[in-house]
Amino acid sequence: VYVNGKQVSQFDYLLKEDDLVEIKKENNLPLEILYEDQDFVVINKPSGLLSMSDGKEKEKTAYHYVSEYLKKQNKNQKVFIVHRLDRETSGVLMFCKNEKVRDLLQKDWNKIVYLRGYMALVEGKGLKKQGTLKNYLAESKTQQVYISNKEKGKLAITHYKVIKEMKNQTLLEINLDTGRKNQIRVQLSNINHPIVGDKKYGATSNPIRRLGLHAHAFGFVHPKTKKKYEFKTDCPKEFYGR
């Protein structure tokens, strides 16, 4: 309980006229809730946390923490995942509270979601100030995504803009037209600028001790109300170098 912005624990505390009383719920989640309403929960997922279970890890996932958080409010509340971020990617991740809205989103995902923005710290420098990467991507039996052709792969379109050049790295702002698995990681590796910390796709350095990819912006049109929602988070400070 807070009175005029200060926490109060005294059970017989006397209130005065015009005192502002606030009751704040404790939130011990290892992630930040950016927004919540009757249909959605939007979080800022930390790096290192799975979006949902991979069959091995069931409890320490964003899905698990959000589900437990909602069940404390309503034991019958369900949660549905509509998109994912890789374990080592941080940033904006959305969950649905009901199946109907989930289905509407998935049915017209590319029409409903109008903004998918990332910040990427890549190896090397010398990139054009801005550019567009277009490739066809396919996935091997070992879950390695690779550049393919039109017959075997799916089209992936990524736009980038140079934000800052450092001694051995470049910070990019990324916007997606498509949302293929590992899209940004594979396409940047293909132009010899892999994301730092991304050993899977050719990175040889890891100066920030994590994958240099952060989903900083996400925008969509509510499939029922047609209202626009847009969420943005700060780029991790370590991406800017010293």
Whereabouts are the PLM-identified features?
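RNA pseudouridine synthases
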Residues: 1-141, 237-241
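Short beta-strand/turn micro-motifs at beta-sheet edges
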Residues: 30-32, 80, 148-149, 159-161
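Conserved hydrophobic positions within beta-strands
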Residues: 33, 122, 159-162, 195
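Short small-residue beta-strand/loop micro-motif enriched in glycine and branched aliphatics
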Residues: 49-52, 145-146, 170
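Glycine-anchored helix-breaking recognition loops at helix->coil/strand junctions
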Residues: 78-82, 146-147, 203
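Short aromatic-glycine motifs in intrinsically disordered, low-complexity regions
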Residues: 143-152
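Pseudouridine synthases involved in rRNA/tRNA modification
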Residues: 151-157, 164-167, 171, 177, ...
